[in-house]
Amino acid sequence: MIILVISWGFDYVVAKFGMYDLTPTSLLFVRIAAGTVIVGIIKVIRRDWSLIDKRDIPVLIACAIFGQILYFECEYNAMTYLPVSLLTIVLGFVPAFSVIIERVFFKRRANRKIVFGILFCIIGIAFVIGADFSIILEGRLVGYLIAFGAIICWNVYNFLTASLEKYDPISLAFWQLLCASVLISPIAIHNMIPPTQWSGSLWLIILYMGVISSAYGYMVIVYALKVIGPTPSAVYSDFMPVTAAICGAVFLHESLSPLQIIGGIIVIAAGFVVIREKGNLMNSGRVCDIILSDKQHTLERKE
């Protein structure tokens, strides 16, 4: 997951360069299509011919829509309004939002530290946006709203994918990518310049995004969602602003104000506290389950 976070942090910079030649939708399509081919080859090499159950197809389609299409559509379009480093700080709210979803929809408990962590995440985001208030009316407000749309989409994807834990991660990643490729292809291909006109640098961008961002990325994230769950997986997004900020400064010559840097640190630190406490709650829950199971076995033996 750490390697994935670093590569996805650099992906923002790569995508921004890619959008000089392709529209966000077209870039997203070639990224997903390339990833589909690569994961498909891996699936064939493993001789994995497994399919998705008919009853799970609606969930699979929803995963493709929210995780592969809408999330990156929001992300890429937000880049046209916001610097990469600023965008990733806002997306650092993903873990806290994940805990909120768990509490509201799944009635999973949250202790005081988690609640305070979420509040500090919100404060950190307010610092980031507040420092940018002078130019919000110039269009950045739209960028922030689109970024929050990405946060919602990614959390929906995380919980939907976690519900399909019975499938092999590589197989599930392939079917999600294939489904997304089919869904987005009509619009993307219609508005895309012919591949014969692509520059050498654009081909390298597509290769990176297809191999690392899509193929490797989704195989890892699907596996992580299966093993450690949605909220623990989401915490790793808190470290993307660091990678993205460095890459943005080096390759795009972007900069952040002191207040935005402080806000970013608050978001990352608070998100880390949230996930650590969430992990403690999950571990204590597992211990309780083990104790109850042992007691049940003891009673059965006595009977």
Positions of predicted regions on the chain:
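Specific transmembrane alpha-helical segments of multi-pass solute transporters/efflux pumps
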Residues: 7, 11-12, 43-91, 127, ...
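Specific alpha-helical transmembrane segments that line the substrate/conduction pathway
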Residues: 26-37, 67, 72-109, 114, ...
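Hydrophobic/small/kink-forming positions within alpha-helical transmembrane segments
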Residues: 9, 13, 40, 64-69, ...
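Helix-helix packing/entry segments at the starts of transmembrane helices
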Residues: 28-30, 86-93, 159-181, 211-250
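Hydrophobic transmembrane alpha-helices of multi-pass small-molecule transport proteins
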Residues: 39, 61, 92-93, 110-132, ...
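C-terminal-most transmembrane helix of multi-pass membrane proteins
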Residues: 31-33, 130-131, 202, 238-303
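Hydrophobic alpha-helical transmembrane segments of multi-pass integral membrane proteins
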Residues: 26-41, 62, 113-123, 142-149, ...
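Glycine-/small-residue-enriched transmembrane alpha-helix faces in small-molecule transporters
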Residues: 1-28, 134-163, 182, 285-303
